[in-house]
């Protein structure tokens, strides 16, 4: 008997090991034999849809992460305060888009308790976050396009957060009701009338029920779509392009939702292909998330650092007073245009000062006019003085000697000009007015 038992054990041992060996042999091409069968869709080369969606979702995760960093890093460079108030909502939108790309992996992986629960809860919540941000942005655009000033940034973010929390409450209640159901069998067996609770698999749900749980998300999508149309009407046209971005995004989202709902509830069943339910959800997530990135996120990031026309106009009239070397040179150059030569403006009255250079009328012609004494010279001139009168010359329009390249009147030029005039003019009596060098005594 002992020998027979030993023989049976030796023959039965391979039978226990045979299912494991068969499972290892049935691993699809491209997957490791030690890999959990739950993740075969991620590496199965015979069904390439999982690998393609995995690559698309991975690229989306990287792109969304980079755009989030760019948007946050551009905060100090945003000149328009109205655009700065929308940055919080747009970052919240990017986080929702990043979650959609990550949820694609849960739809590619084969159904289990954790994957089905995450699909049912996060599918509606993540889309609700994105569409709530679009609704809040549309609400802000209604004020901006008509009054050129909108609500504060925390108000816009609070609106998006409250709208998305509604879907969180709906999905939480739905999961509690469907996953934990009361069954009176155990309570009746105990005889105390208490109800027992039996856990139900989250995957055991009809496709139509899954779609019906997303009615609130569809309502948010329709609100964003209709609000984008009304945001295109207003006096301030520079805000209309943001409404166009939202309109394109919601239009693409509506098209994606119509297609995947029809395929998920009707098309797959008609073609007897229930195995395409998971690819349908994964394709819908990846397509709509990329629509968010291409039609809304990238255009908004490109517009966030651009200044408003009002700021550009004010910058032309009142340039920013910086501390750079070029700014100092410009200011000195602008001020030097109106600085007088103090040697020739000592006798100017204070009321006659104007921000115009006294040499601005010089035309470069030969000195032909006679120099006239100023008021101060006539007041201090004694009647008996004749040949030794000191006359302070004034700079006039024709106060330059031929060949001089400088517009400033110099004493040497005055002396040379007066010397030529004294040689040509006839000498008169002592009382005659003689124009002499004001700096040299005879």
UniProtKB/Swiss-Prot annotation:
Q: Which residues lie on this side of the membrane: Extracellular?
A: 24-50, 107-120, 177-209, 264-280
Q: Which residues carry this modification: Phosphothreonine?
A: 424
Name the keywords, alphabetized. Cell membrane, G-protein coupled receptor, Glycoprotein, Membrane, Phosphoprotein, Receptor, Signal, Transducer, Transmembrane, Transmembrane helix
Spell out the InterPro entries in the cross-references: GPCR_3_C, RA-inducible_GPCR3
The subcellular localization recorded is:
Cell membrane
Q: Which GO terms describe its cellular component?
A: extracellular exosome; intracellular membrane-bounded organelle; plasma membrane; receptor complex
Q: What function is annotated for this protein?
A: This retinoic acid-inducible G-protein coupled receptor provide evidence for a possible interaction between retinoid and G-protein signaling pathways.
Q: What's the protein name? A: G-protein coupled receptor family C group 5 member C
Report the source organism.
Answer: Bos taurus
